[in-house]
Amino acid sequence: MFEQWDALCAVLFSFSIAQELKTHADIVNQKGEKIGKAELIQTNSGVLIKLEASNLPPNAELAFHIHELGKCDPPDFKSAKGHFNPFKKKHGLLNPEGPHAGDMPNIHTDDKGNVRVQVLNPFVTLKKGKKNSLFKEGGTALVIHGGPDDYKSDPAGNAGKRIACGVVK
């Protein structure tokens, strides 16, 4: 009896692992050099993004967004286009008419320019075929800006130039 139960548990556990949705993005700087990585994991509440990066401005507050196209052409990363906004909202976590699905809290670097943070984005999914899927046609990208997002100014929060980018794979 217990052997059958153990076998059933093993099968169910294997199935749940196989069904877990996760992906990653390699983060590159304006020279195209890899400076970090983000792991993206689907949860019941949205997508958990675990970001680790280095060689960013030290002791800085920096905007961190999901952009609408999966391209990261240095040095300016304009190829990633604007913020991911499938629901046509206004920009900003503090905007009553927002936010964009790609809007996320600012990140903070340490005195050496390193960041290690986890951000839950409840507005996006890794499930294919959904309007807010990061796997939409053309893909999406994670972008780090050189300044903080003010959480309200349209279209991008006065966050400054794009200093790092990673295509969601």
Curated annotation (Swiss-Prot):
Cofactor(s) the record lists: Cu cation; Zn(2+)
Any one GO molecular function term: copper ion binding
GO terms classed as biological process: removal of superoxide radicals
InterPro entries with a match to the protein in the record: SOD-like_Cu/Zn_dom_sf, SOD_Cu/Zn_/chaperone, SOD_Cu/Zn_BS, SOD_Cu_Zn_dom
Cofactor annotation remark: Binds 1 copper ion per subunit. Binds 1 zinc ion per subunit.
Similarity comment: family membership: Belongs to the Cu-Zn superoxide dismutase family.
Protein name per its UniProtKB record: Superoxide dismutase [Cu-Zn] 1
Protein source organism: Aquifex aeolicus (strain VF5)
Gene this protein is translated from: sodC1
